[in-house]
């Protein structure tokens, strides 16, 4: 079965757009892509189309006049091209079409989604508590499964265009508001795996959230301004977006790639972490330089100073600013050592949590957060950082 997928983007969004396409084609074949756009160069389509032939897929540019929507109000971090999705059912030759935003990755097969019974509805989507105008129910428009015949039968595109012309300046979330106002309760709710919105993690830093690394949702949506290509985005599965971004077309053709970011980037299994409120972390850069076989995870529940973020230049360092509180637990699970070497207060009782997790805990004499010597596997003079280096070099892992 061939699958029709529509995306909308502008020239500035080419890299995210191509990443979405790569992710789809790594897991699916026989796909016809339709890209609604006003300014993407034809050369891009011609070259990409040649690459897609090996997976029996096609891509087509569908030009939309941006003047139709350029003056329309949109939601935050969204531009006029978001309104292009209204035309999705007009450009395909199939009975069913899937619309996807370009801040999405697909991690599995889509045949099951395409075969869902829409139960007489014109559209299937995933619930979104932020859907529109402060309503507590509605759907997110980043993924829309549409019955083409019903859209044409009811002239839905014309109705949406008329509604948008009337209300685009008063709605809060642009095209998403318009679609929700039009369909109201007349849509089929689909399982959240088909539009799992990790992008909203940024609004729920302290809320417990599910770890998704080993079993990612079928469609991952980096909704919100916190995109994975931002330098320090906090969303879950940020690294997975970069894996799909990194895929070359031979890997897509043969489906033989390692999609584990940490294996792909050759990250050491020797992992050490610390959580801090302060940029004053004793001998941190020295330790990073002297221990290249260790990967340092530096987390902070706040914005990080340049002093800390600059350490990202080292391949054995990852910085997490405004860290998800749940990620602290995940980092503890994966780490061997916790370093209590930052000045200032302890963050979220993390030293005790590290002990309860069975981690080795090392500290300098002037940075230790507890006077209980039994909490630590080593307390070192801040004047002798090489003693800590030597201790860590002697740690073996299975």
Curated annotation (Swiss-Prot):
Gene Ontology MF annotations: glycosyltransferase activity; metal ion binding; nucleotide binding
Pfam families tied to this protein: Glyco_transf_8
CDD domains in the record: GT8_A4GalT_like (cd04194)
Residue segments, region GT8 domain: 1-259
Residues that hold Mn(2+) according to the record: 101, 103, 221
Listed Gene3D superfamilies: Spore Coat Polysaccharide Biosynthesis Protein SpsA, Chain A (3.90.550.10)
InterPro entries assigned: Glyco_trans_8, Glycosyltrans_8_dom-fam, Nucleotide-diphossugar_trans
Family matches, as SUPFAM superfamilies: Nucleotide-diphospho-sugar transferases
Domain of life: Bacteria
Residues bound to UDP: 8-13, 101-102, 221-227
UniProtKB keywords: Glycosyltransferase, Manganese, Metal-binding, Nucleotide-binding, Transferase
Family membership noted in the UniProt record: In the N-terminal section; belongs to the glycosyltransferase 8 family.
Its job: May be involved in the polymorphic O-glycosylation of the serine-rich repeat protein PsrP. Has hydrolytic activity against UDP-galactose and to a lesser extent against UDP-glucose; no glycosyltransferase activity has been seen with tested substrates.
PANTHER family assigned to the protein according to its UniProt record, in alphabetical order: GLYCOSYLTRANSFERASE 8 DOMAIN-CONTAINING PROTEIN (PTHR13778), LIPOPOLYSACCHARIDE 1,3-GALACTOSYLTRANSFERASE (PTHR13778:SF47)
Other facts noted in the record for this chain: Encoded in RD10, a pathogenicity island with an atypical GC content that is associated with invasive pneumococcal disease. Pathogenicity islands account for greater than half the genomic diversity observed between isolates. The main function of this island seems to be correct synthesis and export of pneumococcal serine-rich repeat protein PsrP.
Name of the molecule in the record: Glycosyltransferase GlyF
């Amino acid at each position: 079965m061939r699958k029709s997928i529509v995306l909308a983007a502008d020239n500035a969004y080419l890299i995210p757009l191509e990443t979405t396409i790569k992710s789809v084609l790594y897991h699916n074949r026989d796909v016809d892509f339709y890209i609604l756009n006003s300014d993407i160069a034809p050369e891009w389509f011609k070259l990409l189309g040649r690459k897609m032939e090996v997976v029996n897929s096609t891509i087509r540019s569908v030009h939309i006049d941006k003047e139709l929507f350029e003056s329309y109000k949109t939601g935050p971090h969204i531009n006029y091209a978001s309104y292009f999705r209204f035309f999705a059912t007009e450009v395909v030759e199939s009975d069913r079409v899937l619309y996807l935003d370009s801040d999405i990755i697909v991690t599995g097969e889509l045949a099951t989604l395409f075969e869902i019974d829409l139960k007489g509805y014109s559209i299937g989507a995933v619930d979104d508590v932020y859907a529109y105008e402060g309503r507590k129910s509605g759907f997110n428009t980043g993924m829309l499964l549409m019955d083409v015949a019903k859209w044409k039968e009811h002239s839905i595109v014309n109705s949406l265009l008329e509604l948008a012309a009337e209300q685009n300046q008063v709605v809060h979330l642009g095209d998403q508001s318009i679609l929700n106002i039009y369909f109201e309760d007349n849509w089929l709710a689909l399982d959240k795996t088909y539009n799992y919105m990790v992008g909203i993690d940024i609004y729920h830093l302290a809320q417990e959230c599910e770890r998704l690394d080993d079993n990612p949702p079928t469609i991952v949506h980096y909704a919100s301004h916190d995109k994975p290509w931002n330098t320090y985005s906090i969303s879950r599965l940020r690294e997975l977006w970069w894996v799909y971004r990194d895929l070359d077309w031979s890997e897509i053709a043969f489906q033989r790639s390692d999609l584990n970011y940490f294996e792909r980037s050759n990250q050491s299994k020797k992992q050490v972490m610390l959580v801090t409120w302060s940029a004053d972390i004793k001998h941190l850069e020295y330790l990073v330089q002297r221990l290249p076989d260790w990967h340092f995870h530096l987390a902070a529940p706040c914005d990080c100073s340049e002093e800390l973020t600059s350490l990202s230049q080292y391949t054995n360092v990852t910085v997490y600013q405004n860290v998800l509180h749940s990620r602290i637990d995940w980092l503890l699970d994966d780490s061997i050592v916790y370093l209590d070497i930052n000045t200032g207060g302890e963050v979220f009782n993390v030293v005790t949590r590290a002990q309860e997790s069975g981690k080795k805990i090392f500290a300098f004499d002037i940075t230790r957060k507890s006077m209980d010597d039994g909490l630590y596997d080593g307390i070192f003079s801040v004047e002798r950082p090489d003693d800590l280096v030597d201790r860590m070099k002697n740690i073996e892992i299975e």
